[in-house]
Amino acid sequence: MGTMRLFLLAVLFLFSFARAGCDPKIVNIGAVLSTKKHEQIFREAVNQANKRHFTRKIQLNATSVTHRPNAIQMALSVCEDLISSQVYAILVSHPPAPTDHLTPTPISYTAGFYRIPVIGLTTRMSIYSDKSIHLSFLRTVPPYSHQALVWFEMMRLFNWNHVILIVSDDHEGRAAQKKLETLLEEKESKADKVLQFEPGTKNLTALLLEAKELEARVIILSASEDDATAVYKSAAMLDMTGAGYVWLVGEREISGSALRYAPDGIIGLQLINGKNESAHISDAVAVVAQAIHELFEMENITDPPRGCVGNTNIWKTGPLFKRVLMSSKYPDGVTGRIEFNEDGDRKFANYSIMNLQNRKLVQVGIFNGSYIIQNDRKIIWPGGETERPQGYQMSTRLKIVTIHQEPFVYVRPTTSDGTCREEYTINGDPIKKVICNGPNETIPGRPTVPQCCYGFCVDLLIKLAREMNFTYEVHLVADGKFGTQERVNNSNKKEWNGMMGELLSGQADMIVAPLTINNERAQYIEFSKPFKYQGLTILVKKEIPRSTLDSFMQPFQSTLWLLVGLSVHVVAVMLYLLDRFSPFGRFKVNSEEEEEDALTLSSAMWFSWGVLLNSGIGEGAPRSFSARILGMVWAGFAMIIVASYTANLAAFLVLDRPEERITGINDPRLRNPSDKFIYATVKQSSVDIYFRRQVELSTMYRHMEKHNYESAAEAIQAVRDNKLHAFIWDSAVLEFEASQKCDLVTTGELFFRSGFGIGMRKDSPWKQNVSLNILKSHENGFMEELDKTWVRYQECDSRSNAPATLTFENMAGVFMLVAGGIVAGIFLIFIEIAYKRHKDARRKQMQLAFAAVNVWRKNLQDRKSGRAEPDPKKKASFRSITSTLASSFKRRRSSKDTVNVVV
């Protein structure tokens, strides 16, 4: 018996030990709920989760409390009642009082300190999406800002592109604004206006007046109940709740007191099961249970902290458990499909689309998380309308942006009284001018001042305004650019600048300028039919042939001229020598005649030059046969030289040499760029975009990018100043410039053919009428008249098509040569006269000297013959000769001085 008793005790002990080793792991889940009833629902949900995920390893246990009256008591309760029980997660509902938005905050702060996940059940404030504040907060409901997705889908459904966003300047309003702007940016659109106001503002009339002045009639409102009430009251005073308007709001804006003042026809949202705490408890417990079972399949799982007193260590497994929760997917929830985004907010949520009809909210559709499903109930819009409003009001006052680009838009300063000076076209008609505000390029700092605009595009604008019945105000683009996309603050985000940017940002309603139509721009704006067809061409400086004074010598090189001159003198010397030493150099017909003199060196020179210049030989020809043979050879040489010179002179002076211009876009100097040949275009223009996009032109683009100019006017001036060799731009502009500035010329065939169009936003109500009027203007000849008036292609140089003829410039050197000969002749005649006088004086002096010697000799002979006294007459004659000789010496000296002066 004793043995049996011991055996039974041993079996009982072993059974108890085995059972103790198989006890499941108790995992506590905490909750802070609004009522005791919801605590019971929470416990039942935990039991259901244990049954659904039955396992002997893990058993879930429910630990819950109700909300406390203040934040401190709530934080203490979380520490004492929940964290002390080592809870793995805490579920928290919204407090019963609708105005108490901060009760989940102490729970989130306390649990977040230890990295214990907190799952919100009905808390929708956007502040809980900020993970820098609420580290471990998740929720099974979306924030209020998530309603922006439904507004965006409604805009797409009803094709509304013009919206005004009115938000309160608090965290909730800014979150809704950011969400909607992000969605619109993906669609490459934006709100026409964002109006913010301080929460608690009672009179919002001034704010809504800004909205009333806009074309958009779709108003999206994000505000609290009280602020929404103030907006509705001010809108009713301004008659902004009637026909034509659309009001899209969220859930708060049609709740409580706001609903009493909301206008009939307003469309609001209600989150399906948004306030069903019981349903969210069931879904949250199911998600936590699923995540816990996934967590315990991992290794190194630590237990949560036990209590807050003296414990400052975070739960090491807490961040891991949060990541597991955020990656959880529960498709069969009571409230629908449950998933979390990177902020811990619920991704997919279902909304009822409510329409206020006769002061009652009526469901007219459902948003199922992806798209809107409309039911059979018709929407009653503001003003009792049943037809969908267009969402905008066509304004008859348009803001026109343009750019200085002659001949399409001329910009000139106004007169002292602020008006435009009266001018006339080439046809004698008054030029139509408009006042355009814009930066003045001639004043430092480029201040915005009123200026006068006129030209092709201004005439076109005036005609469109008259035909389509709208008024306008014109301004010049602030940055002086046509428009291209550029990165913002070195980020991947790109924005349009120039006229494109002003149009897309709402600063302008229409672009009336020579804006090139291309694919990049057409993706963002709407173009009219082209009002001017054109392409790209190349502008270069014209090589004007210039004649110098020595141009008549250009047919021969200087070496050849030197050899010809040397040959003349060599032949002359040889003729002289041959004729001098020839026995037949002195020729006579018969013996009675005197012999002719042989050829002198001077005559030989005269003969040699005469034959070369074909001046005719009157005398001084060679007499000997040998010299005459050389003379004939020299004549043949002269004939060949003169004929060659004459032929080449015509080529140099009459016929233009072919200029080495650019042949087109495929010219080797463009395709193989170098620093010796610089070409460029305008920065951030359609031409710049074209070269950037074309792979085969990438080499050219890299060269051009370093040299591009800010404006076409600067580049054209650079070509004229020889700072730029070629400028690539719109053919219409360059051909006009070449017709006005005669030192410029376009070259090569057109490429990248396109056209100029009027730019409008994609949703512009004017786009169809503008295109129709442009086509009509082409048909009735108005565009042709504008071409004749403004884009007038005139011939700069009448010689371009006239027969080539010699001008004074070509032959000026020859006339200078004649003038030089005349001057040289006058100079030499003075020398000859002086020389002749000197020679005559010398000869007379010698004659007197001989006469004096003869008299002296006669007297000497008389003395020797015995006469004591000379004859008185002879003595007087001798004295006279001596006196004359003395005066002759004086004159000789004076004449010598004169010759020196002349020389």
UniProtKB/Swiss-Prot annotation:
Q: Which intervals of the chain are annotated as region Pore-forming?
A: 601-620
Residues on the Extracellular side?
Answer: 21-557, 646-810
Hey, which stretches end up on the Cytoplasmic side? 579-600, 623-628, 832-903
Q: Which cysteines are joined by disulfide bonds?
A: 79-308, 420-452, 436-453, 742-796
GO CC field: neuron projection; NMDA selective glutamate receptor complex; plasma membrane; postsynaptic density membrane; postsynaptic membrane; synapse
Q: Which reaction does it catalyse?
A: Ca(2+)(in) = Ca(2+)(out); Na(+)(in) = Na(+)(out); K(+)(in) = K(+)(out)
Q: Where are the transmembrane segments?
A: 558-578, 629-645, 811-831
Q: Which top-level group of life is the source organism from?
A: Eukaryota
Intramembrane parts of the chain: 601-622
Give the activity regulation note.
NMDA glutamate receptor activity is modulated by zinc ions. The NMDA glutamate receptor activity of the heterotetramer with grin2b is stimulated by micromolar levels of Zn(2+). The NMDA glutamate receptor activity of the heterotetramer with grin2a is inhibited by nanomolar levels of Zn(2+).
Annotated localization: Cell membrane; Postsynaptic cell membrane; Postsynaptic density membrane; Synaptic cell membrane
Q: How does it sit in the membrane?
A: Multi-pass membrane protein
A GO molecular function term, named singly, is: signaling receptor activity
Name where it mostly resides.
Answer: membrane
- Gene Ontology terms: biological process: calcium ion transmembrane transport; chemical synaptic transmission; ionotropic glutamate receptor signaling pathway; regulation of membrane potential; regulation of synaptic plasticity; response to zinc ion; sodium ion transmembrane transport
Query: What InterPro entries has UniProt attached to this entry?
Result: ANF_lig-bd_rcpt, Glu/Gly-bd, Iono_Glu_rcpt_met, Ionotropic_Glu_rcpt, Iontro_rcpt_C, NMDA1-like_ligand-bd, NMDA1-like_N, Peripla_BP_I
Residues binding glycine: 514, 516, 521, 686, 730
Query: Keywords of this protein's UniProt record, alphabetized?
Result: Calcium, Cell membrane, Disulfide bond, Glycoprotein, Ion channel, Ion transport, Ligand-gated ion channel, Magnesium, Membrane, Metal-binding, Postsynaptic cell membrane, Receptor, Signal, Synapse, Transmembrane, Transmembrane helix, Transport, Zinc
Glycosylated residues? 61, 203, 276, 300, 350, 368, 440, 469, 489, 769
Instruction: Tell me the first and last residues of the signal peptide.
Output: 1-20
Q: What does this protein do?
A: Component of N-methyl-D-aspartate (NMDA) receptors (NMDARs) that function as heterotetrameric, ligand-gated cation channels with high calcium permeability and voltage-dependent block by Mg(2+). NMDARs participate in synaptic plasticity. Channel activation requires binding of the neurotransmitter L-glutamate to the GluN2 subunit, glycine binding to the GluN1 subunit, plus membrane depolarization to eliminate channel inhibition by Mg(2+). NMDARs mediate simultaneously the potasium efflux and the influx of calcium and sodium.
Q: Which family does it belong to?
A: Belongs to the glutamate-gated ion channel (TC 1.A.10.1) family. NR1/GRIN1 subfamily.
Which PANTHER family would you find in this protein's record? IONOTROPIC GLUTAMATE RECEPTOR
How the protein assembles, per its UniProt entry?
Heterotetramer; the NMDAR subunits are modular and harbor tiered domains that function in concert to regulate opening and closing of the cation-selective ion channel pore. Forms heterotetrameric channels composed of two GluN1/zeta subunits (GRIN1), and two identical GluN2/epsilon subunits (GRIN2A, GRIN2B, GRIN2C or GRIN2D) or GluN3 subunits (GRIN3A or GRIN3B) (in vitro). Does not form functional channels by itself.
Q: What the record says about its domains?
A: A hydrophobic region that gives rise to the prediction of a transmembrane span does not cross the membrane, but is part of a discontinuously helical region that dips into the membrane and is probably part of the pore and of the selectivity filter. The extracellular N-terminal domain (NTD) is a site of allosteric regulation to modulate overall receptor function.
Q: What is this protein called?
A: Glutamate receptor ionotropic, NMDA 1
Species of the source:
Xenopus laevis (African clawed frog)
Name of the coding gene: grin1
